[in-house]
């Protein structure tokens, strides 16, 4: 596995692969890798001849009161895990490499509509940061495929929309959420939770499942389902940020004409913000 930090070295290797007619898959990450990330790498290996994993804690997608400085950084451990999976390149640029003129002077990518609401409403500027850094990575790696986890479902749809709107020739692939035995979605932020909090956090998946079962049984009173779910989360000790039933592909509010839904949820457990979702087809 090659460990690359500089753009020139990355581009040189990408050019050689392209000249050899090899296909490339990209897995963008912020590090602190877990089994969910490794499942993305496994999917990438199935799709392409060569796999590039980027590890970059992107300051542009963190808000003023968010945990950029405290975000877990486990680079040595991450590299060992990626080497075990026979990843071809791990790209670990510095902030100065990605944003040489600083954030204030950086051009950015905004994806309208689909980036608003849900996490976009709770974290203003977040998806601008995500879309900008992913666009830069797409330009640098020029992948045929890019793998993202479905746990961050709005992010996945934002990136699909961005790639389509900007005519970027990449197939954006969503990979199913990896879960703990308890049902809790794997996340780098789970490391902030105590064992007791992890037990409480399982309520998020349970409430999502209950709502999904109601939809499958024909209940289309979306507003009541959402309100009941929020109350259930509160009773379990979580503070709901949002709980919404949406059209799966557009993320607009669900209507009676829809049959493909995604239930999107975010809730706080102490200071830790958890997100999860379930896709439902009826």
Curated annotation (Swiss-Prot):
EC number of this enzyme: 6.3.2.1
GO biological process: pantothenate biosynthetic process
Lineage: Bacteria, Pseudomonadati, Pseudomonadota, Gammaproteobacteria, Alteromonadales
Protein name: Pantothenate synthetase
Highest taxon listed in the record's lineage: Bacteria
Pathway(s): Cofactor biosynthesis; (R)-pantothenate biosynthesis; (R)-pantothenate from (R)-pantoate and beta-alanine: step 1/1
Reactions that this protein is recorded to catalyse: (R)-pantoate + beta-alanine + ATP = (R)-pantothenate + AMP + diphosphate + H(+)
Keywords: ATP-binding, Cytoplasm, Ligase, Nucleotide-binding, Pantothenate biosynthesis
Gene: panC
HAMAP family per the UniProt record, alphabetical: PanC
Organism: Pseudoalteromonas translucida (strain TAC 125)
Record's miscellaneous remark: The reaction proceeds by a bi uni uni bi ping pong mechanism.
Listed Pfam families: Pantoate_ligase (PF02569)
């Amino acid at each position: 596995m090659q460990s690359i930090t500089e753009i020139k070295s990355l581009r040189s290797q990408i050019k050689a692969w392209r000249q050899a007619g090899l296909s490339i898959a990209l897995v963008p990450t912020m590090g602190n890798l877990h089994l969910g990330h490794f499942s993305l790498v496994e999917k990438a290996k199935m799709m392409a001849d060569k796999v590039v994993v980027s590890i970059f804690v992107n300051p542009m997608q963190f808000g003023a009161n968010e945990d950029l400085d405290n975000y877990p950084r486990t680079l040595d451990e991450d590299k060992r895990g990626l080497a075990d999976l026979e990843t071809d390149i791990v790209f670990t640029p510095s902030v100065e490499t990605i944003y040489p003129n600083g954030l204030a002077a950086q051009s950015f990518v905004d994806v309208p509509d689909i980036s608003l609401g849900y996490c976009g409403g709770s974290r203003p500027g977040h998806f601008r940061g995500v879309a900008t850094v992913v666009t830069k990575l797409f330009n640098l790696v020029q992948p045929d495929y890019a793998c993202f986890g479905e746990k961050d479902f709005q992010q996945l749809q934002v990136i699909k929309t961005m790639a389509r709107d900007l005519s970027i020739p990449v197939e954006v692939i969503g990979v199913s959420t990896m879960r703990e035995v308890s049902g809790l979605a794997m996340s780098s932020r789970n490391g902030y939770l105590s064992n007791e909090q992890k037990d409480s956090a399982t309520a998020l998946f349970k409430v999502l499942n209950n709502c999904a079962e109601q939809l499958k049984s024909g209940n289309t009173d979306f507003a009541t389902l959402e309100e009941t779910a929020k109350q259930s989360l509160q009773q379990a000790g979580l503070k709901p940020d949002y709980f919404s039933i949406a059209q799966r592909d557009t993320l607009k509010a669900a209507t009676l004409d829809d049959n493909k839904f995604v239930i999107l949820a975010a809730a706080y457990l102490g200071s830790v913000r958890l997100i999860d979702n379930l896709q439902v087809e009826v």
